[in-house]
């Protein structure tokens, strides 16, 4: 039977044993090579991040030069100034913006309206109560 299998597969049985989970030839330096590969990947990643940070710093320097040249402010600076101006104007001003209505303040009036309507319906005769309840 073995002879027939060897003839049919043409010498591929050695590889078949390995593929099926048989004895594998282990490289004694495999762990060392894997560790070196991982270290090389880490170094490449660090170099890539450093290069990206350097490019971004250069871009920001160019952007800042353009802002200085044309008197443009950063978005964060504009927002901070607008917020400060709004707060300064609203401290003693009569025209300060109205405060938002806290949640739940307008709900009580609606509940009162419903309860008043219910009390009025209670005093109506039976057939009229049925009409209003629908």
UniProtKB/Swiss-Prot annotation:
Q: Enumerate composition-biased segments (Basic and acidic residues).
A: 15-81
Which domain of life, per UniProt? Eukaryota
Protein name, per record: Complexin-1
Task: Provide a GO CC annotation, any one.
Answer: cytosol
What does the record list as coiled-coil region(s)? 29-69
Q: Where is this region: Interaction with the SNARE complex?
A: 48-70
Keywords for this entry?
Cell projection, Coiled coil, Cytoplasm, Exocytosis, Neurotransmitter transport, Synapse, Transport
Record Pfam families = Synaphin
Q: Which GO terms describe its molecular function?
A: SNARE binding; syntaxin binding
Swiss-Prot/TrEMBL GO biological process terms: modulation of chemical synaptic transmission; regulation of synaptic vesicle fusion to presynaptic active zone membrane; synaptic vesicle exocytosis
What species is given as this protein's source? Bos taurus (Bovine)
What binding partners and quaternary form does the record give? Binds to the SNARE core complex containing SNAP25, VAMP2 and STX1A.
* Subcellular location as annotated: Cytoplasm, Cytosol; Perikaryon; Presynapse
Summary of the function given for this chain in its UniProt record = Positively regulates a late step in synaptic vesicle exocytosis. Organizes the SNAREs into a cross-linked zigzag topology that, when interposed between the vesicle and plasma membranes, is incompatible with fusion, thereby preventing SNAREs from releasing neurotransmitters until an action potential arrives at the synapse. Also involved in glucose-induced secretion of insulin by pancreatic beta-cells.
Region: Disordered, residue numbers = 1-112
